[in-house]
From Swiss-Prot:
The keyword Transcription regulation does not apply. Pfam families: Sulfakinin. One of its GO terms (molecular function) is hormone activity. This is Sulfakinin-1. Keywords: Amidation, Hormone, Neuropeptide, Secreted, Sulfation. GO terms for cellular component: extracellular region. The modification Sulfotyrosine is found at Y6.
Amino acid sequence: EQFEDYGHMRF
């Protein structure tokens, strides 16, 4: 998935 919340950054 592209819109996953990676700690603090969103891709």
